């Protein structure tokens, strides 16, 4: 039985609590927040604490779902005794802090996971299988919603675009060149377009908008053999294959990814990893993601 705690009881923290109820062989022993949320302790039949040391002393694993600017502080506290730590994305936005986290993680052999949930999106996982023997020429991401009043301690690059940067790295590998532009309002980036040139020659284009009336999550992929159009919200995937026969018409097939809860799958994977030796290979990818986000910000603010 793994004793787990949740640090941060905002919207994302509560989402984690709801999903932890559906995972076997864990015990939710403590929830922590600076603001009193005792009603949540009663609802989830656990202990509420305003003392982070209580959390540290009693947990085998913890989930940090606090504002981004506090991630580093809570990681330092939790890493004193806890060996399994899950932190919502982005891990941090400061490169020096990221390097310090890597150093501590390696020295103390901490199992550290970062909440890039789209890797667990069933549509993305199905696309990954479809692309197994297919060379990608181009990736096109569009991610929009109306989060203008919700993004407070960062901007859309680290809040929204980082998801698609992660998927670009996941599907097509390292990036060698970045070109970006965007719209700023009151020193915050509200709209951004970025082109990433990968080392394997694939070109990724990402559009992110935090002030759009319509919520969109799409991924369009051009490969040597076909064109794939995916809706990450509805799980619909349309595959258009080139017809090399006598007929000029291309062949089109529509499929749907299974209806799975991405956050639940992500948390199950984290709990499973708590029982194994630390494997933090993905931290290198997340570090590259942070570097890319910083470069995109730099280019937009310099324009």
Residue ranges and their predicted role:
Residues 1-43, 271:
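N-terminal Rossmann-like dinucleotide-binding module
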Residues 16, 44-104:
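Beta-loop-alpha module in the N-terminal Rossmann-like domain of NAD(P)-dependent dehydrogenases
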Residues 61-66, 110, 199, 269-303:
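C-terminal helix-rich "cap/oligomerization" subdomain common to oxidoreductases
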Residues 69, 92-148:
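A contiguous active-site-proximal alpha/beta segment in oxidoreductase catalytic domains
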Residues 86-87, 112-114, 230:
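Hydrophobic residues in well-ordered beta-strands that form the structural core
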Residues 115-122, 147-176, 286:
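Mid-domain beta-loop-alpha active-site segment that forms a flexible
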Residues 117, 223-284, 299:
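C-terminal glycine/acidic-rich active-site capping loop/insertion
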Residues 159-236, 264-278:
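Contiguous beta-strand/loop segments that form the cofactor/metal-binding neighborhood of enzyme cores
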């Amino acid at each position: 039985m793994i004793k787990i705690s949740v640090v941060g009881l905002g919207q994302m923290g509560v989402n984690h609590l709801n999903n932890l109820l559906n995972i076997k062989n864990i015990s939710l022993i403590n929830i922590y927040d600076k603001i009193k949320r005792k009603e949540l302790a009663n609802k989830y039949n656990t202990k509420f604490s305003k003392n982070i040391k209580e959390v540290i002393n009693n947990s085998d694993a913890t989930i940090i779902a606090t504002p981004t600017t506090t991630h580093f502080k809570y990681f330092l506290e939790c890493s004193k005794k806890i060996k399994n730590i899950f932190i919502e994305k982005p891990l941090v936005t400061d490169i020096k802090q990221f390097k310090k986290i890597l150093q501590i993680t390696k020295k103390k052999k901490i199992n550290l996971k970062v909440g890039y949930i789209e890797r667990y999106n069933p549509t993305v996982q199905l696309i990954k299988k479809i692309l197994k023997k297919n060379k990608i020429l181009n990736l096109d991401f569009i991610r929009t919603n109306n989060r203008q009043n919700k993004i407070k301690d960062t901007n859309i690059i680290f809040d929204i675009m980082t998801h698609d940067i992660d998927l670009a790295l996941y599907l097509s590998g390292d990036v060698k060149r970045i070109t970006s532009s965007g719209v700023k309002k009151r020193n915050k980036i509200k709209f951004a377009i970025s082109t990433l040139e990968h080392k394997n020659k694939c070109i990724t284009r990402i559009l992110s908008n935090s002030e759009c009336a319509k919520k969109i999550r799409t991924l369009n992929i051009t490969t040597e053999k076909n064109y794939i159009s995916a809706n990450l919200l509805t799980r619909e995937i349309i595959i258009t294959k080139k017809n090399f026969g006598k007929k000029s018409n291309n062949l089109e097939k529509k499929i749907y990814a299974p209806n799975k809860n991405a956050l639940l799958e992500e948390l199950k994977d984290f709990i499973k990893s708590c029982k194994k030796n630390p494997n933090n290979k993905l931290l290198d990818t997340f570090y590259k993601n942070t570097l890319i986000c910083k470069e995109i910000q730099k280019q937009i603010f310099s324009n």
